[in-house]
């Protein structure tokens, strides 16, 4: 088997990761939406989807968990 077949799928989508990278820079939902050229609702959806994947109930918990897992850096 090829090495690529053994690589696990990333936990976050590319866009979810972009949102959280901006979130840890202390950007607001509005600022993130503006920077990524998406709506504030879409930003909230990306955050919510990531929170569901992580099994956490808040943005702060999601950030802490992503940092702990090495999925996000400060």
From Swiss-Prot:
CDD domains: LuxR_C_like. It comes from Bacillus subtilis (strain 168). SUPFAM superfamilies: C-terminal effector domain of the bipartite response regulators. Involved in the regulation of spore formation. Directs the transcription of several genes that encode structural components of the protein coat that encases the mature spore (CotB, CotC, CotG, CotS, CotV, CotW, CotX, CotY and CotZ). Also controls the cgeAB and cgeCDE operons. Signal peptide: none annotated. This is Spore germination protein GerE. Residues 29-48 bind DNA. It comes from the Bacteria.
